[in-house]
Amino acid sequence: NVLLVEREKFPRYHIGESLLPFTFEPLKRLGLIDRMRASAFIKKYSVQFVSTNGKASQPFYFNTRYNEDVAQTWQVLRSEFDQMLLENARNKGANVVENTEVLGLLRDGDKVTGVRVRQPDDTEAEHNASITLDCSGKESFTASRNRWRIRDPYLNKVAVWTYYKGAKRDEGIDEGATTVAFVPEKGWFWYIPQHNDMVSVGVVAEGNYLTRDGLKAPKDIFQREITHNKWIEEHLAAGKSTGDYYITNEYSFHSQYCGCEGLLLLGDAFCFLDPVFSSGLMLALKSGVLAADAVNDAIQSNDFCPSRFEDYATTLRDGIENMRKLVYAFYNPNFNFSDLTNKHPDLAGEVTDCLSGDVNKDYSRLWNAVLEFAPIPDNLPYGMPKVPEREMV
């Protein structure tokens, strides 16, 4: 039996709207490909980069590397996409409760045995389980309360975003492309076309850059930064902001552990890197598949000791570290993808693979080439299960 506890009533707003090609297999496994194809979600075939002078690069088309199924993905409206996922879980037998807040974890010594919740009628209840999965996203329920949450030493950015209606789109299959448009100081805009003639657009940079000149209001910061990239300025000129502006900061973190006895962390509850390559949804879906397999094996053997989940942790951390290296290079002032692929044209496919979410492969050749332009970080020593002393004996 599976109990799925949601704090809010769906559908609800959420940021993080661009899928990567390698989300295809998790969606296929969930049985959602036909629903995705029948949806109004904008089809995404590529990602492109735009310099500060407004000049767009040749797009990275996914069909140069992958078959037709994988090469086309989607730009999603999270309220609709997440509702689809929730309904799918319910239709497959999960007991889904909404408007229900998790107040704490139930414990028997070091072991997590379930959750304590506040129900819609404001009463409290306890639910026991062989294993609890923390999918709380950026709230990072467990990592925050257990003081496992560790900020990334370098990725301390600020994001400001809004939505435009009627903004310009490129033509043909480029209509749904994700665009990364640069502003000074290694800041950048995302530009994500959505259905209903909407565009998600935001700027990401260091906080001291965005708040220069004393600006603090998200709208003022956003409107000023538009003028620093001609492509963004021209594409937004025909549209109109919905009027809602959002801001978040210091969002990059890693959990010291992926869980403990009776508990496993998934997706953003385990780690969030940076929005630049839209890896959040991909890693969330990937961790869901990995965790499902690991938990199923644990149920079959009736063994939930933390060491059983070391393979889950290792696979997920290896993928995160590969993406993290690419993110670090992106923010280095001495690095850009054009220089890398011009010098090493044979590695263009490797870059596309990593950008597409194929993160669990050997990228040694790519990282050696990146080192010619910028340093890359060592792997962080985080993310394995927390093993009780009695299990270590």
Features from the language model and the residues they span:
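Glycine-rich FAD pyrophosphate-binding loop
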Residues: 1-15
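N-terminal FAD cofactor-binding segment of flavoenzymes
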Residues: 12-54
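Helix-loop-beta segment of a Rossmann-like dinucleotide-binding subdomain
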Residues: 57-76, 114, 204-208
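Short beta-strand to alpha-helix junction loop
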Residues: 65-88, 211-217
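C-terminal helical "tail/cap" subdomain of flavin- and related membrane-associated enzymes
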Residues: 293-393
